[in-house]
Amino acid sequence: MAKYKKLGSVTLFDAQNTKEDLSKLGNPLERLSQVVDFEMFRKALEDVFENKAKKSHAGAKPYDVVMMFKVMIIKHYYNLSDHQVQYQITDRQSFREFLGLASGDKVPDEKTIWAFSEKMAKSGLSERLFQQFVDELNEKGLIFNEGQIIDASFVLAPKQHNTRDENKDIKNGKGGDLWNDNSNKKRQKDTDARWTQKGGQNYFGYKNHIKMDKVSKFIKKCLASAASLHDSQALDYLLDESDQGQSIYADSAYVGQCNILAKWDMIDEICEKGYRNHPLTEEQKESNRKKSSIRSRVEHVFGFEEG
């Protein structure tokens, strides 16, 4: 008699069965595919990414621009690093389904993802298309606007082995003037990442700041910064008129931002902070627990990145 439950043999219907199981569990990417016509973004993308002057058809063909924009949606929604995007697309069937990739299709590598993201950002396309995408979700009723969750997460970068003088120049904003006589070395240097400390632990890299719709859990707005930027300093950028009159949920790092909240008439659901000789009361602790239970919904977003 078998000790464990048999998992069953692989059949031709496994992929379809898995897709149906994901649908029953509420696959958010499948819902996006059903309600958003991503072809609406093609012309704007091709205007930036297609090389009109290129006559030769030699060399590897680029990935479809709409599919790559969907890759950016995955990166944006789950707040993933370029490396994690590549890994998760390879690993997760729901991601491949969303992108229209079969199991044997080649997945864009992290360098391709980075290059696409950089070109979108530098052309101004990133902010414009993501706003159009969020507007479309609003119109389709996928963003509920019944409260916003604010949070930040570290994205670690490789440590740089610079001299003290080089680090001083970088800190003073002169990093672009370094290593001009050695292009290979300069290409490998990261002059934007910064050191910071949190909870007694040192971090080197960047920080992702996000605003997430409380109900749909979709990231409506995000900001990438050096790790040294305090969480609260991103708040003014993240909030806008679409948040008018809503509740805001955040940890105690955002305490003291009354003027910014008042600007949009927001309801303060930020966790309170205890101070020396003024610890939190039991009532405040209980209030924080209730707020944190809602704020913790953001953890699934950062789970891929910090896991």
Predicted feature residues:
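Polybasic low-complexity intrinsically disordered regions
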Residues: H83, Y87-T90, G100, P108-S252, ...
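A Lys/Arg-rich helix-loop hairpin that forms a DNA/phosphate-binding surface
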Residues: G59-A60, L101-D105
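Short, basic interhelical loop/turn and adjoining N-cap
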Residues: Q93-S103
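Contiguous, well-ordered alpha-helical segments that form the cores/surfaces of helical PPI scaffolds
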Residues: V65-H76, D91, W114, Y237, ...
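Helix-centered, glycine/charged polyanion-binding patches within enzymatic domains
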Residues: K171, S247, S252-G307
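Basic, short loop/linker segments at the boundary and entry of helix-turn-helix/winged-helix-like folds
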Residues: E30-I73
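Charged, often Cys/His-bearing segments associated with DNA-binding zinc-finger transcription factors
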Residues: M1-D47
